[in-house]
UniProtKB/Swiss-Prot annotation:
Keywords: Cytoplasm, RNA-binding. Residues 134-154 are annotated as: Disordered. GO terms for biological process: trans-translation. It is found in: Cytoplasm. The gene is smpB. Its main location: cytoplasm. Signal peptide: none annotated. InterPro entries: SmpB (IPR023620), SsrA-bd_prot (IPR000037), SsrA-bd_prot_CS (IPR020081). One of its GO terms (molecular function) is RNA binding. It comes from the Bacteria. GO terms for cellular component: cytosol. Required for rescue of stalled ribosomes mediated by trans-translation. Binds to transfer-messenger RNA (tmRNA), required for stable association of tmRNA with ribosomes. tmRNA and SmpB together mimic tRNA shape, replacing the anticodon stem-loop with SmpB. tmRNA is encoded by the ssrA gene; the 2 termini fold to resemble tRNA(Ala) and it encodes a 'tag peptide', a short internal open reading frame. During trans-translation Ala-aminoacylated tmRNA acts like a tRNA, entering the A-site of stalled ribosomes, displacing the stalled mRNA. PANTHER family: SSRA-BINDING PROTEIN, TMRNA-BINDING COMPONENT OF TRANS-TRANSLATION TAGGING COMPLEX. This is SsrA-binding protein. The lineage of its organism: Bacteria, Bacillati, Cyanobacteriota, Cyanophyceae, Synechococcales.
């Protein structure tokens, strides 16, 4: 798959890939204010505890922490942890809601990207990993590193 030169990753949620098995991914727009956009472009956002909920036929992103913009006045700055509306098609919202309600899955943001001037969230439909799964993944990564080291030394 070719890398699109118009897409730039602003914030990445590496922890989500460690704690969850990602089954599907979606791209969604986010409803943001001006100071939030400036802060995200500066890389001052945290996706660590963020998740999506579905209410009244809409998708909302909770616990996405976007730090207040430094040079904006205190009056016009945003609340760092407010709920943000996700912009998805109706059929995508219905599909995601069905997956979350029936199978016990959750929707977590994987990264925020800048796509042709618009900030988008890459969402993942995820199932939580157990502790032994996490340990297994760590062991596999270590063996891969050792194999690569051995091949590199030859």
């Amino acid at each position: 798959m070719a890398v699109d030169p118009n897409v730039k990753t602003l914030v990445d949620n590496r922890r989500a890939r460690f704690e969850y098995d990602i089954l599907e991914t979606y791209e969604a727009g986010i409803q943001l204010t001006g100071t939030e956009v400036k802060s995200i472009r500066a890389g001052k956002a945290n996706l660590q505890d963020a998740f999506a909920l579905f209410r009244d036929g809409e998708a909302w992103l909770h616990n996405l922490h976007i730090s207040p913009h430094d040079t904006a006045s205190k009056v016009f700055n945003h609340d760092p942890t407010r709920r943000r509306k996700l912009l998805l098609h109706r059929r995508e919202i219905d599909r995601l809601r069905g997956l979350v309600e029936q199978k016990g899955l959750t929707v977590v943001p994987l990264k925020l990207v800048l796509n042709r001037g618009w900030i988008k969230a890459h969402l993942g439909v995820a199932r939580g990993k157990k502790l032994h799964d996490k340990r297994q993944a760590i062991k596999e990564r270590q063996t891969q590193r050792e194999i690569q080291r051995e091949l590199k030394e030859r």
